[in-house]
Amino acid sequence: MAVPARHTSSAKKNRRRTHYKLTAPTVTFDETTGDYRHSHRVSLKGYYKGRKVRDTK
């Protein structure tokens, strides 16, 4: 079974983890409905790129 030859120090571990970052979600203003929505997603009212693509209740 493979075993690490040396103990990984906390500094080495933290330097490796510096690239694990959270990014803020991309939110855009939907001119059709007047609401904010995520980019490349259907709005809550069923519109995508200005067209009705889903029926909502």
Curated annotation (Swiss-Prot):
One of its GO terms (molecular function) is structural constituent of ribosome. Residues 1-23 are annotated as: Disordered. The keyword Ribosomal protein applies. Keywords: Ribonucleoprotein, Ribosomal protein. It holds the Pfam family Ribosomal_L32p. Belongs to the bacterial ribosomal protein bL32 family. This is Large ribosomal subunit protein bL32. The gene is rpmF.
